[in-house]
C-alpha cells in the first residue's frame, strides 16, 4: 500500500488522451513551464496536498498528491499547498497500487472538487 495518491499527469495519465499509458503514468507533465520550489513549514500529515516533482526541486508541473498518512520525510522537500478539510473518508477509500509506480488498472477519478481560500 502506498502512503499517498498522485494525480495530474495530463500526458500519460489522462484516460481520454491518445497518449494514455499506465506504465508511464506519473512521468508526464503539461506544456506549461515548471514551477519553482516553494517549501513551507506545512507538515505532510494525513490529508495534505503537495506538488509532485522529479529529482529537481524546481520541476513541479501539473501533478500533485494527497498524503494518506504522516510522511515527515517529505517536509521541506515538496511544496505543500493545501489540506483536505471535508470528505477525508473518500480519500481513505482511494485505490492503492502495489506496482513499481503505484498505479492501478482502473484508477479512481476526480469527478469534482472545490477549493477554498
Question: For the regions a protein language model found, what residue spans apply to each?
Answer:
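Cyclophilin-like peptidyl-prolyl cis-trans isomerases
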Residues: 1-117
Amino acid at each position: 500500500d502506498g502512503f499517498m495518491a498522485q494525480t495530474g499527469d495530463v500526458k500519460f495519465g489522462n484516460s481520454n488522451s491518445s497518449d494514455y499509458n499506465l506504465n508511464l503514468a506519473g512521468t508526464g507533465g503539461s506544456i506549461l513551464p515548471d514551477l519553482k520550489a516553494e517549501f513551507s513549514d506545512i507538515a505532510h500529515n494525513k490529508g495534505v496536498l503537495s506538488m509532485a516533482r522529479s529529482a529537481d526541486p524546481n520541476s513541479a508541473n501539473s501533478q500533485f498528491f494527497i498524503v494518506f498518512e504522516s510522511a515527515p520525510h517529505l517536509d521541506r522537500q515538496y511544496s505543500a499547498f493545501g489540506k483536505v478539510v471535508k470528505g477525508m473518508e473518500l480519500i481513505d477509500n482511494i485505490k492503492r497500487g502495489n506496482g513499481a509506480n503505484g498505479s492501478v488498472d482502473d484508477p479512481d477519478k476526480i469527478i469534482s472538487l472545490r477549493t477554498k481560500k
